[in-house]
Amino acid sequence: MSLIKEFKAFASRGNVIDMAVGIIIGAAFGKIVSSFVADVIMPPIGIILGGVNFSDLSIVLQAAQGDAPSVVIAYGKFIQTVIDFTIIAFAIFMGLKAINTLKRKEEEAPKAPPTPTKEEELLSEIRDLLKAQQEK
């Protein structure tokens, strides 16, 4: 099998397509959550903490000299990323928990008892007839 045919077979499998759709939706969801955190959650937290903007927090290791930019540890961006991750992970957890709850409810639905086969019905009739004969 040629390399191109193998790739077509791989790419056309359902799992790969499902994974690609999941990655695209996940990336879009990540942008939504990042915007939610940066634009909705962080401003009130910044006010509570005295007007601190986490993105601006950094430690200057070496000041800018001439054309060379300053060397900084931008720990504020790291804090922002950790908060984004925590909220995304929590949202995914809640979504999966809801899906699992729905699946459990579907599984717990009582199943109708199986109908007896013709052989079982005949055996039941024979049993009933034998019991009736013994009682006489």
Curated annotation (Swiss-Prot):
UniProt xrefs under SUPFAM superfamilies: Gated mechanosensitive channel (SSF81330)
Subcellular location: Cell inner membrane
A GO cellular component annotation in the UniProt record: plasma membrane
Keyword Translocase attached: no
Membrane topology: Multi-pass membrane protein
Keyword terms, alphabetized: Cell inner membrane, Cell membrane, Ion channel, Ion transport, Membrane, Transmembrane, Transmembrane helix, Transport
Assembly behavior: Homopentamer.
Family classification: Belongs to the MscL family.
Name listed for the protein in its UniProt record: Large-conductance mechanosensitive channel
Organism the protein comes from: Shewanella sp. (strain W3-18-1)
